């Protein structure tokens, strides 16, 4: 059993003072009955709700987010960057201490684990862990067999040497280049074509801008980047950008291994 005001503070995302005010206002129910006493002891199997939402009384929560573009996932944003943080997407969960496991660049989308379990976060991001991360990239330029070989050999950067990575070319696209308007007396020219390549890449580290820098090494610029897997965990493609769900028990078990 646990005091009701403590339950609200631990699992409702509010302070003990706010919990007492919520109780006084009749906003809290236990098994469907309004309870106003902060000292009321709720059983472990009692259903406690705040403003009609049932509280999930778990110490740790684990979420799978399809990160949208434009959101930062760093716990220490760049000075002057007012972009929203991914944690703001979880404001209705009432969970304290949430943080993203690792980070994705602001313009990178896809799989991101969000939790309040610091031990798990450390295990997945520890330097010696080397959890595989797979991305779908759209790059400006064409990739070939030599690029695949270069990724497989690894790249030398100023601060680290990347481990061998797997690059798979999925598709080459031709798109019309955006050019300046032609003068009225100028004969129309056929539109120039620009090559883009869709590729899948799996890396073992997670350094700053690593995937983008690796493609720069082979003369290509990343224009879109989406993470689709991290270790044994795959992005749930039914989630729209900005949507999330709790990890399933088997998913949590797999990433704990």
Protein language model regions, located:
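Basic, flexible Lys/Arg- and Gly-enriched helix-loop patches that mediate nucleic-acid binding at interfaces
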Residues: 1-257
